[in-house]
């Protein structure tokens, strides 16, 4: 990114158990994928660790939900609110993020259907992403550990998550 670049970039691993956001090669958010919602308005009261601490300990006006199941979005509205709040947390140190120029790369399970991919893309856009890209989790894991995914050699990747486990062999960028 150049000195005057207003496009900010983050990578998000939207997991069943935890959500991680990376900015400038640093983990800036690592929180449980949990949202505490007001039962009347269905608005987020807390996300992440704060919502996790409320689980099972709140009064009848508040419910806690895990918006992802088996690596896919199960509750679109809750997922969107969780992503919006976590992106706010990740970007609060930089005033330029308040502009509409946010590029988000989101990891998705390799077995995702078109509907599931669209749900991730839509949630990311509604949460503030101007440009949204998806990448399969095994490919992101391979790139993240420094494997040359374009090399003509096979690399086995095992991605163990809270809702899915994926095993892939990556060679020649595919």
Model-identified regions with their sequence ranges:
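Nucleotide/phosphate-binding catalytic cleft detector across ATP-hydrolyzing
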Residues: 1-162, 168-174
